[in-house]
């Protein structure tokens, strides 16, 4: 049975957004996928009658009306390249307020309440100031960062080039986050105003991550433990924009301070199953690591 509500999913082609759409449409919900390149993305859902595709760009307010037409609820993540929320994201939040959207699910960051310099903190604060009907998902570091952001170093050098020191990280699988977001959107009343800190079931050092990857992939993976400054300089030299490099470096500094090691039962409570294990993630994404 098709649900008459229509939900806008932004970042629809990303790790989280794609799972949000899969979960919602499996339950009969109509979804609009907001994407930067509709022509390229349309093929992803050509066999799914519950998905329509619309052009959307946070920086282009002219894309807002058509994307939001007939929409009751919204899911969004902050595109990593947008690091100045006041200019990049606030116009969109104000538009949601004008449209009286019934529920807005935002993927934030664990520990964000203690880190006012992060873009996520500023977005949360503005959403609360506008009195948007929010749910904040505050995940720990994504397992999928390893097969995206850090993929090249693993493929080419068998190395985790990540400035996390000896700190532990309670990694979460983005597929779990996407499923949780969909659960919240399908059960709006009980999730409005909630701020969920979402983690996996274990907190690992990157030495332990390297050991697990070595065992599963069948080749030696090392953890070189670069300094924050060396990491930042290296990724900028490789072409990462400075603003994005600064945010990444700041997040790993937060990790070094011990703020990524927290383990919560929230994922299991919302999913009604255990969170995906790190070992399972590596097995599922084995081909991405070369």
For the regions a language model picked out, list residue spans one by one.
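Substrate-binding strand-loop-helix patch
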Residues: 168-175, 199-215, 229-230, 276
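Terminal hydrophobic/aromatic helix or amphipathic segment near a protein terminus
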Residues: 196, 212-257
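Amphipathic terminal alpha-helices
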Residues: 266, 271-290
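Conserved Rossmann-fold cofactor-binding substructure of NAD(P)-dependent oxidoreductases
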Residues: 54-71
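Glycine/proline-rich active-site loop of Rossmann-fold NAD(P)-dependent oxidoreductases
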Residues: 146-152, 184-195, 261, 290
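Substrate-positioning beta->alpha
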Residues: 163-184, 194
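Glycine-/Pro-rich loop/turn segments that contact NAD(P) or position catalytic residues
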Residues: 79-159
């Amino acid at each position: 049975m098709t649900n008459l509500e229509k939900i806008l999913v932004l970042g629809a082609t990303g790790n989280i957004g794609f799972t949000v759409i899969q979960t919602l449409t499996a339950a009969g919900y109509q979804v609009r996928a907001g994407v930067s390149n509709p022509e390229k993305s349309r093929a992803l859902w050509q066999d799914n009658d519950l998905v329509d595709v619309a052009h959307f760009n946070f920086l282009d307010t002219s894309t807002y009306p058509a994307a939001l037409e007939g929409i009751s609820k919204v899911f969004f993540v902050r595109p990593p390249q947008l690091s100045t929320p006041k200019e990049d994201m606030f116009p969109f939040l104000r538009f949601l307020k004008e449209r009286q959207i019934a529920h807005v699910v935002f993927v934030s960051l664990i520990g964000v309440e203690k880190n006012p310099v992060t873009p996520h903190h500023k977005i949360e604060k503005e959403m609360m100031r506008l009195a948007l009907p929010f749910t904040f998902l505050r995940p720990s570091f994504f397992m999928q960062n390893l097969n995206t952001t850090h993929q090249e170093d693993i493929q080419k050098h068998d190395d985790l080039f990540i400035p996390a020191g000896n700190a532990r990280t309670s990694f979460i699988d983005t597929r779990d986050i996407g499923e949780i977001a969909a659960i919240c959107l399908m059960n709006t009343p009980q999730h409005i105003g909630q701020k969920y800190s979402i983690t996996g079931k274990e907190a690992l050092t990157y030495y332990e991550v390297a050991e697990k990857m070595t065992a599963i992939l069948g080749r030696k993976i090392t953890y070189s433990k670069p300094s924050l400054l060396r990491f930042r300089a290296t990724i900028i030299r490789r072409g990462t924009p400075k603003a994005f490099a600064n945010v990444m470096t700041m997040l790993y500094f937060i990790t070094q301070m011990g703020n990524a090691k927290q383990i919560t039962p929230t994922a299991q409570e919302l999913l009604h199953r255990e969170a995906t294990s790190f070992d399972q993630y590596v097995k599922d994404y084995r081909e991405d690591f070369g």
